[in-house]
């Protein structure tokens, strides 16, 4: 439940009675393993003296060979059967949406359909920096992001990096990365420069959700390993550099049948369109009713830097459908013609929907959850996150909506089915249209409008996690057997604990860099300036020393101010120990510790702009962002 890939290696070696060894591996060992389950985050599910855990082969995800080892994707659970990983709940959520989607499809006469699955194509953003420069930055080494750094003269203002020509070292890295991913069966499809300097993106071909999740975990691991071969470091943190865009992960999600039909693709017949509209309404209903869970699924200390910062979607969850589909829903809701040239009302199951070419509307990059022709693009995920959490929520919430639809329609006489269906879709649109917003999500006016509509605006991870154990959320997961209540409570504890630990590590790193690197360096530079000033006056009493005098005064004043901020951060960290609950600690870290960290950074970044380059103790933003050529 750390969100990263775990490994355990078993050899084929076995002893024989005569003291020799043979190579064998039993089917039992293949199907089930027994690793230690106490050393991972478990949220109280396992104690140190309760170490037994089990791995179980996931036969729906491909085995592969990596570094001459046969790697078998597995689920991980405790001795008592509680899920200790992100794979098990994902597989359960896929079963849930399969069950409920099949009920709905049978109502439309899809007798040849035997299963439904969700598919995902996650786009992965990342930064590349030079290894030698990375090694000189404690903050990057310890936390994955820069905790200090003045804005360089040039950032992303010229928009010249996005889709720009790829630099030779980066191109060589991408070529080897593609080759390594293809060897593992990961179909990397697209790569390009992103908006910020040194930022890039990789996108694979979509596949079944649990396989896509495994592939994305592997992709992040391989990206970092290949980078080292090229003297680079791949940064996956959501916000490694202040002042330029951070990195996210777009989760392109759809639903398809075993016959190859995409259930989010408008059909060619009235009946097929009625089916599409019902599934569309299920997604709309799910996103509206469980907007808090979707926000929680992407909540992390790193992602808090992105959401709502005019580089990523706002923290308010909303849906973008595009103008054409919006007009269709409006026509159904109000029983009016879809087009002013038509005189007949739009009726579900009677009319053929107009075709929706994928390029008829601009892609709304400010929307957290956008319809893009035959899929939804969930854009709130952070770049380091496992895509499992978001897809567990999405699958389960849509399964619940489909269950309610099936409960309403099953048993309905054939002669009244279309009328009941039309009413159901119409009522769903009326009840959940507040979640649909096709405008600019970066506009402050939208935040006010969202509040008026009653949408949640959970701005930080502690604020979001406070709703994780709401009664409706527990009921959702337990009713579909995706999580037990015990498993939910353990995950809540793990998420809070992780948030606190991340901010604590960042704060301690800032203090370490300030006291051991920045303050001594600036003091040395001020001393050198003072020495230069005294030498000039000794050689020529009339010499103008105003530059040195003014700069020494300013450096001394700012150094004293920064030292005061260091002590303030230390005092603030000490107060955390006085708080008993994880909830209180997480909120304190967000409201008090994080604020003290920002205050400390302001002073340090100003000192960087005044200190000579040869005295500054670590590489600058200019070095890092433009150092790979």
Please describe what each predicted stretch is:
Residues 1-49:
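Short acidic/glycine-rich loops and adjacent helix/strand connectors
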Residues 7, 243-246:
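Short glycine/serine/proline-enriched coil/turn segments at secondary-structure junctions
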Residues 18, 285-293, 400-411, 520, ...:
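Short, well-ordered loop/turn and helix-capping segments at boundaries between secondary-structure elements
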Residues 21-22, 134, 231, 261-262, ...:
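Short amphipathic alpha-helical segments with coiled-coil-like heptad repeat character
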Residues 25, 364, 498:
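Residue-level signal for pocket-adjacent positions within structured domains
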Residues 38, 47-236, 245-248, 254-493:
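Glycine-rich, acidic/polar active-site loops that bind/position phosphate-bearing ligands
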Residues 240:
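Glycine-rich N-terminal segment of FAD-binding domains in flavoprotein oxidoreductases
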Residues 428-629:
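C-terminal amphipathic alpha-helical interaction region
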């Amino acid at each position: 439940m750390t969100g990263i890939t775990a490994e355990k290696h078993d050899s084929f070696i076995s002893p024989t009675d005569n003291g020799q060894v043979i190579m064998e591996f039993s089917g039992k060992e293949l199907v089930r393993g027994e690793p230690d389950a106490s050393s991972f985050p478990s949220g109280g599910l396992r104690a140190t003296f309760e170490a037994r855990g089990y791995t179980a082969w996931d036969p729906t995800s491909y085995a592969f060979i990596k570094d001459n080892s046969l790697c078998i994707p597995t689920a991980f659970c405790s001795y008592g059967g509680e899920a200790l990983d992100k794979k098990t709940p994902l597989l359960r959520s896929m079963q849930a949406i399969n069950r409920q989607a099949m009920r709905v499809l049978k109502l439309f006469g899809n007798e040849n359909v035997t299963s439904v699955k969700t598919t995902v194509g996650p786009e992965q953003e990342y930064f590349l920096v030079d290894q030698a420069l990375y090694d000189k930055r404690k903050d990057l080494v310890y936390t994955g992001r820069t905790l200090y750094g003045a804005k360089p003269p040039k950032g992303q203002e010229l928009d010249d990096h996005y889709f720009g020509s790829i630099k030779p070292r980066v191109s060589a890295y991408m070529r080897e990365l593609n080759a390594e991913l293809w060897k593992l069966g990961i179909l990397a499809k697209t790569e390009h420069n992103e908006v910020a300097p040194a930022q890039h993106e990789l996108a694979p071909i979509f596949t079944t959700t649990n396989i896509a999740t495994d592939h994305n975990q592997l992709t992040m691991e391989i990206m970092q390993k290949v980078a080292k071969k090229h003297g680079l470091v791949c940064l996956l943190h959501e916000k490694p550099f202040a002042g330029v865009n951070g990195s996210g992960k777009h989760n392109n999600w759809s639903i398809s049948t075993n016959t190859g039909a995409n259930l989010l693709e408008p059909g060619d017949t009235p009946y097929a369109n009625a089916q599409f509209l019902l599934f569309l309404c299920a997604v709309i209903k799910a996103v509206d009713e469980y907007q808090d869970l979707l926000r929680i699924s992407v909540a992390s200390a790193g992602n808090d830097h992105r959401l709502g910062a005019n580089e990523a979607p706002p923290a308010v969850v909303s849906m973008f459908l595009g103008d054409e589909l919006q007009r269709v829903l409006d026509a159904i809701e109000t029983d009016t013609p879809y087009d002013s040239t038509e005189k007949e009302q739009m009726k579900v199951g009677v009319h053929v929907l107009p075709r929706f070419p994928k390029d008829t509307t601009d892609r709304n990059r400010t929307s957290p959850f956008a319809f893009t022709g035959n899929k939804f693009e969930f854009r709130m995920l952070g770049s380091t996150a496992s895509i499992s959490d978001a897809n567990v929520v999405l699958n389960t919430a849509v399964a619940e909506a489909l269950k309610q639809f099936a409960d309403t329609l099953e048993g309905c006489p054939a002669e009244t089915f279309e009328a009941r269906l039309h009413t159901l879709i119409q009522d769903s649109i009326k009840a959940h249209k507040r979640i649909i917003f096709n405008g600019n999500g970066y506009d402050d006016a939208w935040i006010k409008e969202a509040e008026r509509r009653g949408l949640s605006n959970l701005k930080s991870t502690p604020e979001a996690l406070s709703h994780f154990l709401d009664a409706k959320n527990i009921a959702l997961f337990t009713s579909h057997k995706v999580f037990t209540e015990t498993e939910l409570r353990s995950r809540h504890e793990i998420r809070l604990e992780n948030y606190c630990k991340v901010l604590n590590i960042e704060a301690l790193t800032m203090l370490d860099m300030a006291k051991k690197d920045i303050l001594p360096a600036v003091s040395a530079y001020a001393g050198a300036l003072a020495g230069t000033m005294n030498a000039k006056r000794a050689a020529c009493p009339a010499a103008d020393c105003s530059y040195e005098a003014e700069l020494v005064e300013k450096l001394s004043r700012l150094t004293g101010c920064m030292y005061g901020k260091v002590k303030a951060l230390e005092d603030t960290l000490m107060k955390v120990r006085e708080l008993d609950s994880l909830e209180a600690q997480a909120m304190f870290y967000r409201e008090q510790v994080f604020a003290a960290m920002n205050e400390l950074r302001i002073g340090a970044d100003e000192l960087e702009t005044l200190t000579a380059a040869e005295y500054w103790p670590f590489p600058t933003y200019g070095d890092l962002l433009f150092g790979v050529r």
